[in-house]
A protein has these predicted regions:
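Exposed aromatic-hydrophobic patches
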Residues: 325-326, 432-437, 519-529
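Non-cytosolic beta-sandwich-type ligand-binding/adhesion modules
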Residues: 5-11, 16, 33, 38, ...
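Blade-level signature of beta-propeller repeat domains, shared across WD40, Kelch, NHL, RCC1
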Residues: 430-467
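Repeated scaffold domains used in trafficking and secretory/extracellular systems
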Residues: 134-151, 183-197, 225-242, 279-295, ...
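N-terminal beta-propeller domains
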Residues: 2-182, 198, 205-213, 236-239, ...
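Beta-propeller fold detector
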Residues: 177-182, 218-226, 268-279, 321-329, ...
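Loop/turn-rich, solvent-exposed surfaces of beta-rich toroidal or solenoidal domains
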Residues: 335-356, 372-412, 474, 483
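Extracellular/virion structural assembly segments
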Residues: 562-658
Length: 658
């Protein structure tokens, strides 16, 4: 007998040993042994009471559903792993259905991306309203909402001096009336704001007012910018703390900010006004972009170079204004493009990188959080209603310009807020410079180079899609994806297309036709011909083919898979371990103490805990890499008269390494 080490033959299964240990092989050179473990040869001790067993190792752990709401993981019987979503009311923005970071109780109500869908009703995914271009414009334009004699109107202001209608009123039914034409205001409009039912308009040399509450409304010049002209794209004006506040840089680079009282008389020169303390000492050419308010202060913001910032101003009981104090400084290379105060406690920050939500304390100081979402083209406009805020984005909704909705009532574990894409200006790109809410919640927004887009009162978009996060069941092991179940209303009001999404393509699974009344359960074999570690699905909802006011609705879905990890084997091997043994050729081998020596050697191998090579010469001798899990020595005979005769049967339990 010889125990030697050798490398595996090229025809043998490759051995991958990450520990760097060297397993021992045994080559038969004399005695005909049955088995070798880590190079230690043995004769099989197979009997009725000590059989040789080889079985599949358990690969599914017993699980107890400890989620907040016990559900799919507590189901038994089918063997499926199930992942379902019955609501998407926490919006988009996840990559994985089982979060690498964050709160799993929130992630299960979110999806990856979407367009044209409204997820905000708990337990229901439906289509959004469509929008229509109602008034074209070649440059910038602004839109505001107002109420006159109980009726809602939109007020559109055109920047371009060549626009025939500089101020246009639109009713909820679409009736348009020009209020100010290009003979009344001949200069380029740099900024505009609504407040107290007054519309204030800023040109390079003048500040105009149009009061909708006047008996006979007409354009009136309240102020003259009688020093250097106001510089284009560096003017901000808004109605805060019961007054209009303007902040601007001149063409010569000076900076200033004024509180403007309503002036019904002759035009007042700015040179006679007192600037807000601190507004004249900002960097030359500072770009003012926003004025807004909270419960305890108002704020003036903008940027210098790549540094965005905002300043706080308070108003005392006499109406006097404090000195400007900086309360917001954005990270380097992030410009402040817009601010929008809401509910007295929040200030929305539109930046060159996206949107941040700032919270205001009782002293009017501001602390902001991380980016709620990123927008590579910046955010220039907001509006709000109830707990929702809408932000305008350029090419941010499926490559088109539109709105993204943020739910301030749904803070997330990452200190952000739930959000989702919303209304879209179809096939259009350009900055959104204003957003307004009118007519019981309808939205209107202006797109630079396009014009005024208004949400339709009843009609839905033709289709909308959402893509789920990647479903992995918290493991990268392969799965056999078997079934997809879809839940909808009893009668489907529009088609639903379902596809599997990969990194490079979307493979169509099926189309559920409008009018279908059955519940839907689909075999995934057509889009999963092979096992895969993960899955993602895209659902496309369509509008009703004959009624534009209704469309497909989804209540939820569930995906089912079976785990398919490489199976390990548990092998139970009985071995003779006596001082004297005979191999299958009749050769006598051993010596006194032979059994104890081999048992000790085998136990030493087990104690190291490394993988070992098991060779079963009765089954061809193919080497198997395994870990010894248990060694049991059974001795059922008494010692001889010399009180020796140590020996018995060793049962080795090993698990193959896969």
């Amino acid at each position: 007998m010889a125990i030697t080490s050798r490398a595996p033959h090229i025809t043998e299964r490759p051995q991958i040993d990450l520990s760097g240990s060297v397993s021992q092989y045994y080559e038969i050179t004399g005695n005909a042994f049955d088995v070798a473990i880590a190079g230690l040869p043995f004769i099989l001790g197979v009997t009725d009471s000590t059989p040789y067993r080889r079985q599949t190792a358990e690969f599914r752990t017993q699980r107890v559903d400890q989620e907040r709401d016990p559900g799919e993981q507590s189901l038994a019987g089918s063997g499926y792993w199930i992942r379902s979503q019955s609501s998407l009311h926490l919006g988009q923005g996840i990559n994985y259905q089982e979060p690498l970071e964050g709160d799993p109780d929130q992630t299960k109500f979110r999806y990856k991306t979407g367009e044209g869908i409204d997820p905000w009703t708990t337990g229901q995914i439906k289509l959004l309203k469509k929008t229509t271009l109602t008034e074209a414009a070649t440059g910038k334009s602004y839109v505001f909402s107002t109420t006159v004699n109980g009726a809602d109107f939109l007020i559109k202001v055109a920047e371009s001096a060549s626009a025939t209608s500089r101020v246009l009123r639109t009713s909820t039914t679409g009736t348009e009336t020009t209020l100010v034409n290009n003979t009344a205001i001949t200069e380029k409009i740099l900024a505009a704001a609504m407040g107290g039912n007054d519309l204030m308009i800023v040109t390079p040399t003048k500040v105009w007012r149009y009061s909708f509450d006047d008996t006979s409304p007409a354009i009136h010049q309240d102020y003259a910018i009688n020093s250097a002209d106001a510089a284009s794209d560096k003017v901000a004006i808004n109605y805060v703390k019961s007054r209009f506040v303007i902040a601007y840089s001149t063409t010569s680079g000076t900076t200033q900010s004024y509180a403007l009282a309503r002036n019904t008389g002759s035009s007042i020169n700015f040179s006679t006004l007192t600037a807000i303390n601190g507004s004249t000492t900002l960097p030359s050419g500072f770009t003012f972009t926003a004025v807004t308010e909270s419960s305890n202060a108002f704020y003036i913001g903008g940027y210098s170079g790549d540094e965005g910032m905002a300043f706080k101003v308070t108003v005392d009981s006499s109406g006097a204004l404090s000195t400007m104090v900086r309360v917001i400084l954005l990270p380097k290379s992030e410009q402040l493009l817009q601010m929008y105060g809401y509910l007295g406690s929040y200030v929305m920050l539109g930046t060159s990188r996206g949107v941040r939500v700032a919270v205001v304390d009782t002293d009017g100081n501001v602390s902001y959080g991380p980016l709620v979402f990123e927008a590579t083209n910046g955010v220039y406009a907001f509006t709000a209603r109830n707990s929702f805020v809408w932000a305008g984005v350029n090419a941010g909704v499926g490559g088109q310009t539109g709105l993204i909705r943020i739910n301030l009532g749904a803070p997330l574990a990452n200190n952000g807020y739930a959000y989702a894409t919303d209304l879209v200006a179809t096939s259009v790109t350009g900055h959104v410079h204003s957003v307004a809410t009118f007519d019981n919640g309808r939205k209107a927004f202006t797109v630079e180079g396009s014009g005024l887009w208004i949400e339709h009162s009843t009609d839905l978009v033709e289709s909308g899609t959402f893509t789920t996060g990647l479903i992995r069941f918290d493991t990268l092991e392969n799965k056999a994806w078997k079934r997809l179940r879809l839940r909808t209303p009893d009668t489907l009001q529009g088609d639903i297309q379902i596809a599997r999404v990969t990194e490079t393509a979307a493979d169509a699974l099926t189309t559920v036709a409008q009018g279908t009344t059955e519940q839907y359960d689909y075999d995934l074999a057509v889009v999963f011909p092979d096992v895969s570690p993960d899955a993602s699905f895209r659902f496309t909802l369509s509008r009703n083919s004959s009624d534009a006011t209704t469309g497909a609705v989804i209540y939820g879905y569930s995906a089912k898979a079976l785990p398919t990890p490489t199976r390990a084997r548990v092998i139970q091997i009985p071995l003779f371990c006596f001082d004297r043994e005979t191999d299958k050729l009749g050769n006598l081998l051993g010596y006194e103490g032979y059994a104890r020596t081999r048992l000790s050697a085998l136990e030493a191998v087990e104690g190291v805990g490394e993988t070992v090579v098991i060779q079963d010469f009765t089954a061809g001798g193919e080497p198997i890499e395994a870990v010894i899990e248990q060694i049991t020595f059974i001795r059922s005979t008494p010692p001889n008269r010399n009180f020796s005769g140590f020996g018995g049967i060793v049962q080795v339990v090993a698990r193959t390494v896969v």
